[in-house]
């Protein structure tokens, strides 16, 4: 995939996967993004984004075990890669640098 940067929604999804650790799968990521962003998101949008992030090398996935609760279906569990962590740290640094140049937010303003 050509574009290796992060869009805003991709960043939220990647952060949610980090927060969830070994419990990151479609629905749990959706709920985590909604909880922290305060907005409603579609499960389909989350799935597309998870796979796009995997294509970019920022996530890896494996199939979890099947459970009776899920009708003996398995769920795909996602994990952030080292490249994904680097990308998140880079995004955080850019945002912090830019925030410091907003006059209304400087100390004493």
Question: Model regions: which residues?
Answer:
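Amphipathic alpha-helical dimerization/coiled-coil segments
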Residues: 83-109
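Alpha-helical residues within the helix-turn-helix
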Residues: 31, 54-55
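N-terminal helix-turn-helix DNA-binding core of bacterial DNA-binding proteins
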Residues: 3-45
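Short beta-strand/turn micro-motifs at beta-sheet edges
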Residues: 1-4, 65-67
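Exposed loop/turn and edge beta-strand positions of beta-sandwich/beta-sheet ligand-binding modules
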Residues: 74
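Basic amphipathic alpha-helical segments that dock to polyanions
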Residues: 46-48, 52-53
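Beta-hairpin "wing" of winged helix-turn-helix
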Residues: 56-71
């Amino acid at each position: 995939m050509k574009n290796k940067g992060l869009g805003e929604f991709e960043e939220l999804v990647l952060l949610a996967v980090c927060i969830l650790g070994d419990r990151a799968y479609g629905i749990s990521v959706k709920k985590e993004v909604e909880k922290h962003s305060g907005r409603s998101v579609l499960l389909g949008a989350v799935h597309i984004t998870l796979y796009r992030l995997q294509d970019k090398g920022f996530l890896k996935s494996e199939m979890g075990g099947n459970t009776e609760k899920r009708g003996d279906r398995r769920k795909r569990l996602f994990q952030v890669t080292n490249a994904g962590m680097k990308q998140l740290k880079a995004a955080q640094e850019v945002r912090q640098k830019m925030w410091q140049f907003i006059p209304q937010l400087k100390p004493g303003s």
